[in-house]
């Protein structure tokens, strides 16, 4: 009787069958297997075992494409025997697995299948069905161009029959829009285009609702959208509107299709013609025309405009002229990805932001986010806080800030314009001069001091680095500030202060930093937005970064030249946040301490904690809050050892200069009121700028 037993060779890389006769014997030696005379039959190569799992790290590489396999992504491995009988696994991406050369008899042969998620198990089942099939050959581009498909955004084909549309609320913030490449925020409505690749697997391309290519993938009815019934009523209404817009815009879509059916040169010519026509009829082109110059377009050209252009223009006019075309919403930024429409700066996460919601000509809502101080109250006034969406969900301090903003609507903008009319400027100058005279008589100042202030005004107007007229620079008459030892406190209201920090009235100050020397030359700076990047809504001593890399070197150079460095900064949140005052104090002082430690230069600091009178409560402006010169006068009279200050050599640097993108003009007016030369941070800290101390 002959017994056939399978045997795995340690010497050879193929399976063996050993036919055992009565005379057959074998024994094992090191590294070799010795057989006596027997019949050894070689069989066909056995398929290598396949294992599937989620990558434990990102160190493995795909055997096919050589790219890294991301952690927690599905990977497939082919297990083979290496030298010495050690198992070796060759990992592949799921899409890179060689189905044409490696066959899998059944999905049950895949090791680790039961540990995978249901969706991945279904994908592997389809993969097993594809194993052994020869992939379709790609058309040879050299022999001739393949038949062109009408393409949409980012390569989406126009064939609606090969794709379907689904909609849901994003489960996380990991998905991104296929059209604009921006992240789709968690729980936001997203619309997916599901297509099938060459191997039969479904691929979903997600879009924002406003980014969905409705022109290339029309939606005839909401019943065609998968997952529609599970959405909230508001999201269902938006999808219904999307379907209605699709029906109304069929004429425009047909025009696009006809244009795309031509060859590349015809398409380019058509696009150039359309752009030329749009340029002629655009409002910008009309503004370029010189006054009195006759229009170049005649009635014949106007009558030749396509019907689609007329429809688009009519929709745009209807939206712009509609009284309810915009609304205001408020919320805390969910991330740091949004930017302010006015200043183009990033809106930090958890910071209060105001959104102006407008509707475009296709009926989609467009949100334009702004910082609180950048919101255009002059062009988009807010009648009442009840008109602000999300107002009730804000904290009490932010609700008070919005109430102040509403009261400013219709009166003035948050950012005063530098190009005011000459009549208004002269009126303000006269009013300021009369006020200064009254203050001067009340405090009984000497005539000589008034003359010195006039000289300081003239000197500041000559050396001012910002483009402003001489008539706008007014030095504020010094107020009587009396200070005694009993007036200095170790606490600010109910908040404790860190060591070396004291409080006087509405000012918190660091009088004597280690190594600080009083001087006739003062180099004064704002803190937030000038020396450090900070956010009001993010508290913490470490929640800041240097505004410019050259700051430590610049400050050290000024200290070496005998300047005393002083920081004058406003922080009204310390007064406004009654329930969180201690946190506000610790955050502000902690940041300043960290900054001083970072630059390694002794600095004197004054923090104005008072609130301005713009809140509508009828109170007066805080004496020490910029643009008032109270902090400068306090330092000059009581914290400079009686040394007279040389105004020609002293200066102030701040970011609130009243420019178009600045949040206010408090710094430039503070410099004017104090009689100091003024620089913006860009002028002073950028190496190409000319500034004192360089």
Curated annotation (Swiss-Prot):
Residues 302-321 have a biased composition (Basic and acidic residues). One of its GO terms (cellular component) is nucleoplasm. Zn(2+) 3 binds at residues 340, 343, 371, 374. Disruption phenotype: No visible phenotype under normal growth conditions. Loss of 3'-phosphatase activity and hypersensitivity to DNA-damaging agents. Increased DNA methylation and transcriptional gene silencing. Zdp ape1l double mutants are embryo lethal and cause DNA hypermethylation and down-regulation of imprinted genes in the endosperm. InterPro entries: HAD-like_sf (IPR036412), HAD-SF_hydro_IIIA (IPR006549), HAD_sf (IPR023214), PNK3P (IPR013954), Polynucleotide_phosphatase (IPR006551), Znf_PARP (IPR001510), Znf_PARP_sf (IPR036957). GO terms for molecular function: DNA binding; polynucleotide 3'-phosphatase activity; zinc ion binding. Zn(2+) 2 binds at residues 177, 180, 208, 211. Residues 266-331 are annotated as: Disordered. It catalyses: a 3'end (2'-deoxyribonucleotide 3'-phosphate)-DNA + H2O = a 3'-end 2'-deoxyribonucleotide-DNA + phosphate. Signal peptide: none annotated. Its EC number is 3.1.3.32. It comes from the Eukaryota. Keywords: DNA damage, DNA repair, DNA-binding, Hydrolase, Metal-binding, Nucleus, Repeat, Transcription, Transcription regulation, Zinc, Zinc-finger. Activated by the presence of DNA. Stimulated by XRCC1. SUPFAM superfamilies: Glucocorticoid receptor-like (DNA-binding domain), HAD-like. Residues 322-331 have a biased composition (Polar residues). It is an enzyme of class 3 (hydrolase). Zn(2+) 1 binds at residues 62, 65, 93, 96. GO terms for biological process: DNA repair. It is found in: Nucleus, Nucleoplasm. A zinc finger (PARP-type) spans 50-132, 165-247, 328-410. In the C-terminal section; belongs to the DNA 3' phosphatase family. Nick-sensing 3'-phosphoesterase involved in a base excision repair pathway required for active DNA demethylation. The N-terminal DNA-binding domain binds specifically to gap sites and sharply bends the target DNA. Lacks 5'-kinase activity but is capable of 3'-phosphoglycolate end processing. Inactive on 3'-alpha,beta-unsaturated aldehyde (3'-dRP). Protects partially genes from transcriptional silencing by preventing promoter DNA hypermethylation. Interacts with ROS1 (via the central region). Binds to XRCC1. This is Polynucleotide 3'-phosphatase ZDP. The lineage of its organism: Eukaryota, Viridiplantae, Streptophyta, Embryophyta, Tracheophyta.
């Amino acid at each position: 009787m002959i017994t056939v037993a399978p045997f795995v060779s340690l010497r050879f890389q193929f399976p063996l069958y050993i036919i055992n006769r009565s005379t057959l014997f074998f024994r094992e030696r090191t590294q070799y297997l010795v057989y006596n005379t027997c019949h050894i039959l070689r069989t066909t190569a056995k398929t290598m075992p396949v294992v599937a799992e989620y990558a434990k790290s990102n160190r493995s590489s795909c055997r096919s494409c050589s790219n890294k396999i991301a952690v927690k992504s599905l990977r497939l491995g082919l297990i083979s025997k290496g030298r010495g009988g050690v198992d070796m696994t060759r990992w592949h991406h799921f899409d890179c697995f060689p189905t044409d050369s490696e066959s899998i008899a059944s999905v049950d042969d895949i090791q680790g299948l039961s540990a995978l998620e249901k969706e991945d198990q279904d994908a592997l089942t389809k993969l097993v069905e594809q194993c052994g099939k020869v992939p379709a050959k790609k058309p040879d581009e050299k022999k001739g161009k393949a038949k062109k498909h009408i393409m949409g955004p980012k390569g989406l084909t126009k064939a609606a029959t090969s794709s379907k549309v689904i909609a849901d609320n994003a489960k996380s913030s990991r998905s991104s829009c296929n059209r604009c490449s921006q992240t789709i925020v968690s729980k936001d409505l997203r619309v997916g285009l599901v297509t099938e690749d060459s191997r039969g697997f479904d691929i979903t391309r997600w879009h924002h609702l406003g980014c969905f290519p409705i022109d290339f993938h029309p939606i005839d009815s909401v019943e065609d959208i998968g997952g529609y019934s599970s959405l909230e009523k508001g999201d269902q209404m938006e999808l219904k509107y999307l379907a209605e817009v699709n029906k109304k815009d069929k004429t425009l879509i047909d025009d696009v299709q006809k244009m795309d059916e031509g060859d590349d040169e015809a398409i380019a010519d058509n696009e150039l013609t359309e752009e030329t026509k749009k340029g002629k009829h655009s409002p910008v082109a009309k503004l370029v025309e010189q006054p009195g110059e006759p229009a170049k377009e005649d009635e014949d050209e106007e009558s030749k405009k396509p019907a689609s252009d007329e429809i688009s223009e009519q929709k745009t006019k209807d939206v712009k002229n509609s009284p309810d075309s915009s609304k205001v919403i408020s919320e805390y930024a969910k991330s740091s990805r949004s930017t302010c429409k006015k200043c183009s700066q990033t809106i930090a996460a958890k910071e209060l932001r105001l959104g102006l919601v407008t509707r475009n000509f296709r009926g989609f809502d467009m949100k334009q986010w702004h910082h609180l101080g950048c919101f255009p109250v002059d062009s988009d006034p807010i009648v009442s806080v009840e008109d602000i969406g999300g107002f009730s969900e804000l904290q009490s301090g932010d609700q008070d800030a919005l109430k102040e903003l509403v009261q400013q609507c219709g009166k003035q903008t948050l950012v005063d314009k530098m190009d005011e009319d000459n009549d208004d400027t002269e009126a303000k100058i006269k009013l300021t001069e009369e006020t200064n005279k009254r203050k001067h008589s009340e405090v009984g100042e000497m005539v000589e001091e008034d003359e010195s202030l006039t000289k300081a005004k003239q000197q500041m107007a000559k050396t001012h680095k910002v483009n402003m007229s001489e008539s706008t620079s007014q030095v504020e008459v010094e107020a009587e500030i009396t200070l005694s030892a009993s007036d200095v406190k170790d606490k600010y209201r109910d908040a404790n202060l860190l060591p070396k920090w004291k409080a006087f009235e509405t000012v918190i100050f660091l009088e004597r930093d280690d190594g600080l020397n009083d001087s006739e030359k003062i180099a004064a700076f704002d803190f937030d937005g000038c020396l450090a990047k900070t956010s009001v809504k993010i508290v913490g001593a470490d929640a800041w970064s240097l505004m410019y890399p050259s700051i430590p070197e610049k400050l050290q150079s000024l200290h070496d030249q005998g300047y005393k460095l002083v920081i004058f900064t406003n922080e009204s949140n310390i007064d406004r946040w009654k329930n969180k005052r201690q946190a506000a104090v610790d955050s502000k002082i902690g940041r300043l301490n960290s900054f001083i430690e970072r630059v390694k230069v002794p600095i004197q600091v004054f923090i104005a904690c008072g609130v301005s009178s713009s809140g509508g409560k009828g109170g007066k402006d805080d004496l020490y809050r910029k643009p008032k010169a109270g902090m400068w006068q306090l330092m000059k009279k009581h914290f400079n050892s009686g040394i007279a200050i040389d105004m020609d050599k002293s200066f102030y640097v701040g970011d609130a200069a009243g420019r178009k993108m600045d949040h206010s003009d408090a710094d430039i007016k503070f410099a004017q009121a104090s009689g100091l030369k003024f620089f913006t941070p860009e002028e002073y800290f950028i190496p190409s700028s000319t500034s004192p101390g360089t």
